[in-house]
């Protein structure tokens, strides 16, 4: 992988569908990619629409913004466990994590944790991005007018 041989190349997922996989899986994948890219990995997450969430991925539907908030918080709790040897104890409505054994703790990172960005179209997900994430990715249809009238207020 080219990112392993330079510090100038950023590696990111763009928008990976979050709810189709456990936050534990996303945390582990991101940790490994952060190590492999010399600390230049950004995890991009999106919620996907109800039809795909339920019928394509067979995941129960719930309001995406509160669930995405928990998803990001759970990933950060898992990373904190691995980086700082903090006991894992994340208890949310959608995700609960309380078990981490040494056999499943990845090798340490030599630097910062990965960044997290989420896809957002409306105000609720923008609020999650502002409060929990390192960045936001807007949909291609987000015109300046939409940004001014819907997302920013």
Which residues does each PLM region occupy?
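Active-site-adjacent structural elements that line small-molecule/cofactor binding pockets in enzymes
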Residues: 1-153
């Amino acid at each position: 992988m080219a990112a392993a041989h330079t510090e100038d190349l950023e590696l990111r997922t763009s928008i990976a569908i979050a709810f189709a996989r456990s936050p534990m899986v996303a945390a582990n994948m991101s940790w490994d990619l952060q190590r492999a890219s010399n600390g230049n990995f950004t995890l991009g997450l999106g919620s996907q629409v109800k039809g795909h969430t339920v019928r394509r991925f067979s995941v129960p539907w719930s309001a995406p913004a509160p669930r995405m908030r928990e998803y990001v918080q759970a990933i950060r709790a898992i990373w904190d466990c691995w980086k700082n040897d903090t006991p894992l104890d994340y208890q949310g409505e959608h995700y609960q994590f309380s078990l981490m054994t040494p056999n499943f703790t990845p090798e340490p990172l030599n630097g910062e944790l990965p960044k997290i960005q989420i896809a957002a179209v409306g105000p609720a997900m923008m609020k999650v991005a502002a409060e929990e994430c390192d960045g936001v990715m807007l949909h291609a249809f987000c015109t300046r007018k939409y940004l001014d009238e819907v997302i920013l207020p």
